[in-house]
Design a protein with these regions (language model features):
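N-terminal secretory signal peptides that target proteins for export/translocation
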Residues: 1-12
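Bacterial N-terminal signal peptides
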Residues: 17-27
Length: 294
């Protein structure tokens, strides 16, 4: 009897060991099956025909206090259903694709998460402007397209979001569409100092706002770095060969001054309050007058 009890103890221990092992494997399998939900953000890009361009993307996990970059994840750049480039996210969630377009115009690109055991499938879209460098370019301050904000700023930030989204100014979309239909390419410019995603989120919000309100497609530039950011960007564009950018349509005094300091023409719309108009800047009381000023 004692011998049989002693003989049973190893068997019981074995069963417990097997059971614990199965539970561990089960828990591990469940943990591995739970993937993180990521959010993809992509910035617009500008280039010429058959010229390589960097497409910037960012994969994040949204949090209550801050967003966390998801590193080490495979991303794919897709055009018309075909994978044209691949990249891996760094520790901050950023990835950069190199892509050479072979057709002029506005191209829609998709960035998506590739095969990953850690992150669910996600995708985001962006616009790639492939322009002829001889075509005139019109720079438009996004704030000049919107109804007046409740908070003033030297360079108006983009006030988008569920609680603060602004309506477009009357006739702005129609008039800008007429300007871009046969003659101008358009660059939309805004300042986003408080964007914790380094401009990625603001770029996406502007793109959605412009599409919702039927503005013509164009290249979106999100700037940060204070009042001098626009001037530096204009210099970079000219140095990069985009010398046909000679006209601007803006709302703020700082926007107008950046153009005038470089001997570029600028139209302010709508008509500003007294004292806010820089010398040599043209004024349009509304968007229906803008074409007469260019």
């Amino acid at each position: 009897m004692i011998a049989s009890v002693r003989g049973a103890r190893p068997a019981v221990r074995t069963r417990w060991a097997v059971l614990l092992l199965l539970l561990h494997v089960s828990e591990t399998s469940v943990w591995c099956a739970d993937k993180v939900t990521g959010t993809l953000l992509v910035k617009d890009a500008l280039t010429g025909l058959n010229q390589s361009v960097a497409i910037e993307a960012k994969l994040i996990r949204k949090g209550l206090l801050s967003d966390v970059g998801l590193g080490g994840e495979p991303l794919e750049l897709v055009q018309k259903g075909e994978i044209v480039a691949k990249a891996m996210t760094g520790g901050d969630g950023r990835a950069v694709f190199q892509f050479t377009p072979n057709m002029r115009g506005m191209a829609t690109l998709t960035v998506r998460v590739g095969e990953s055991p850690r992150v669910d499938r996600a995708e985001a879209m962006a616009n790639l402007a492939v322009w002829e460098r001889r075509t005139p370019i019109l720079a438009v301050e996004v704030a000049a397209l919107m109804e007046e904000a409740t908070v003033s700023s030297p360079l108006p930030l983009l006030p988008l979001g569920e609680k603060t989204e602004r309506s477009p100014l009357p006739a702005a979309a129609d008039e800008l569409s007429k300007l871009t239909q046969f003659y101008y390419n358009v660059i939309y410019i805004t300042i986003a100092e408080s964007d914790r995603s380094d401009g990625f989120m603001t770029n996406e919000q502007i793109r959605a706002w412009l599409k919702t309100h039927k503005f013509p497609p164009g290249h979106i530039l999100v700037l940060s770095g204070g009042p001098d950011a626009l001037g530096r960007q204009l210099d970079e564009l000219h140095t990069g060969g985009w010398k046909t950018l000679k006209f601007g349509i803006g709302r703020s005094k700082a926007f107008a001054e950046a153009f005038l300091q470089r001997r570029l023409e600028v139209v302010i719309v709508p008509e500003p309050t007294k004292g806010e108009l820089p010398r040599k800047a043209k004024v349009a009381k509304d968007w229906k007058e803008v074409r007469k000023k260019l």
